[in-house]
Design a protein with these regions (language model features):
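A conserved hydrophobic secondary-structure block that centers on an alpha-helix together
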Residues: 145-146, 217
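Extracellular beta-rich ligand/substrate-recognition surface
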Residues: 19-23
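Aromatic-rich carbohydrate-recognition surfaces in CAZymes
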Residues: 36-39, 94, 127-128, 134-140
Length: 479
């Protein structure tokens, strides 16, 4: 009878000895995936055995990942009752079934009440159905250079939301492009806007980043780049900008918008497929037909399509500048509305001034986007904001690059001063309490690192809000 590690050390070549063709193809293999805890027991022995018997190395690269631990950093062990069955995460499990599974077969049965208490604390409603793709994405995002992975189901919940976001984005695109002219006729006129060109630039940069991440075995970087592009750029910005173009653009603009929507999405599904294969395959089967990639009756799979390759020709620097200005202006408008407590349903006028003629010309072309995303009644361009400021108004001004922005609203100075003073007092009180906590040695010693980090983050956020409120108060005219 052979020792476990001895027989395991023979794996790279033992099944290939009688097949010379397979021997030449598969030895050495490209990469071995393993954990650092068995480097000596298995990896080193495979190298030694394979070199001794064949004169070759067993594999070209070794990808070493961290050990998966529970949310508190303890090593997962069935006998300790802190393991999680991947199927329970994928399919979901109720609390009682989870407790029963994790308190059965414990190495120390007397610990069952402790295990049960922890489970009921961490999973009071059991585990929601996460799905296979969301779990895969979670593990890819966790694959950092660290030696340990403290697995938290809440993070997997976040990636389930990401998969839902991709699904809903695809529904929106199909709803707006199916049965319509998507620019598949090369002779049809198309007018690509700055947002159309910008989203292609963002996609190409993401392709470059993801491919490099895969080449470097940085699955976390690949997952984060895909997440950022889909959620932050494509969904949060381009889909919203495309609505303006579909509603207000001429026929050529609408055609170009539909073409951009569906082609960028089709390529994005290819990009994300290695990490989330099931949802991307399902969506691609519909998107690829509309994008003209395959016919409706074909049985092609996304799995065998070519992977996106970086194309620098699609990176448009001028479009990037224009859209980044637009995004900054929209963010500033939203901050102004929030700071002045303007209800989301209320449309108000905006005044914009700039001394740069070229910048002003660019901004004037962005008016439809500003009105829609900023929920504005109109956009007024002026050389001096004071000429359009309502008499006695204390409306604040936001500065974005070469632009000054002001909502044309009459503000009750006395009421605004009172509101800001109360908010400043509240924030100062919160900051004082946080500083007392963090200066308490007992708290810092005994509190979990996560709690301390949350307290520091809350303190930094409140300090930032305090500075902003004081700045607004200082800008109010004196009575």
């Amino acid at each position: 009878m052979l020792d476990t590690w001895f027989s395991s050390a023979l794996v790279p070549f033992s099944t290939l000895i009688n097949d010379p063709k397979a021997f030449d193809i598969y030895l050495p293999s490209s990469v071995l995936v393993t954990g650092y805890d068995i480097l000596f027991f298995w990896v080193a022995r495979m190298v030694m055995m394979t070199r001794f018997f064949t004169g070759r190395v067993p594999f070209k690269n070794v990808y070493i990942h961290g050990l998966v631990r529970d949310a508190e950093g303890n090593k997962m062990s069935k006998s300790e009752g802190n393991t999680l069955d991947p199927l329970d995460i994928i399919q979901g499990v109720d609390l009682e079934s989870l407790v029963k599974k994790n308190t059965t077969g414990l190495r120390q049965p007397e610990k069952a009440p402790i295990v049960e208490k922890k489970l009921r604390k961490h999973y009071p409603e059991g585990i929601n159905e996460i799905g296979a793709d969301a779990l895969r994405f979670t593990m890819a995002a966790y694959a950092t250079l660290g030696r340990n992975v403290n697995f938290d189901v809440k993070r997997a919940d976040g990636y389930r939301n990401f998969c839902n976001k991709l699904w809903n984005a695809t529904r929106f695109v199909l709803m707006n492009v199916e049965g319509k002219d998507c620019g598949l006729d090369p002779n049809a006129p198309m007018e690509y806007s700055a947002p159309d060109q910008w989203i292609w630039s963002e996609f190409e940069r993401t392709v470059q980043e993801v491919r490099k991440a895969f080449e470097d075995y940085r699955l976390d970087n690949a997952a984060n780049a895909i997440y950022s592009f889909i959620w932050n750029q494509y969904c949060d910005w381009y889909l919203e900008l495309s609505k303006v173009q579909l509603n207000q653009g001429n026929e050529a603009v609408q055609r170009a918008t539909r073409h951009t929507l569906v082609t960028v999405l089709e390529q994005t599904l290819r990009l994300a497929h290695p990490i989330i294969p099931f949802i991307t395959e399902e969506l691609w089967q519909k998107v690829s037909v509309v994008a003209g990639v395959r016919s409706e009756d074909s049985v092609d799979s996304l799995m065998v399509q070519s992977y996106p390759v970086y194309d620098p020709a699609k990176v448009n620097t001028q479009a990037d500048i224009t859209v980044n200005e637009l995004k900054a202006m929209v963010d500033a408008i939203r901050n102004l509305r929030s700071g002045m407590l303007v209800p989301p349903s209320k449309k108000v006028p905006l005044a914009v001034s700039s001394r740069d003629g070229e910048a002003r010309a660019r901004a004037e072309k962005l008016t439809p986007y500003l009105q829609t995303l900023g929920r504005l009644e109109e956009v007024i361009f002026t050389d001096d904001l004071e000429t359009v400021r309502p008499v006695g108004s204390a409306a604040p001004v936001a500065v974005v690059d070469d632009f000054s922005l002001m909502l044309i609203i009459k503000v009750d100075v006395a009421a605004e001063r009172e509101r800001l003073s109360k908010e400043i007092a509240r924030l100062e009180n919160e900051i004082a309490k946080a500083n007392n906590k963090l200066s308490n040695e007992n708290f810092v010693k005994k509190a979990p690192a996560k709690v301390i980090e949350q307290e520091r983050s809350r303190l930094a956020n409140n300090e930032q809000l305090l500075a902003s409120n004081k700045e607004q108060l200082a800008k109010l005219p004196q009575a």
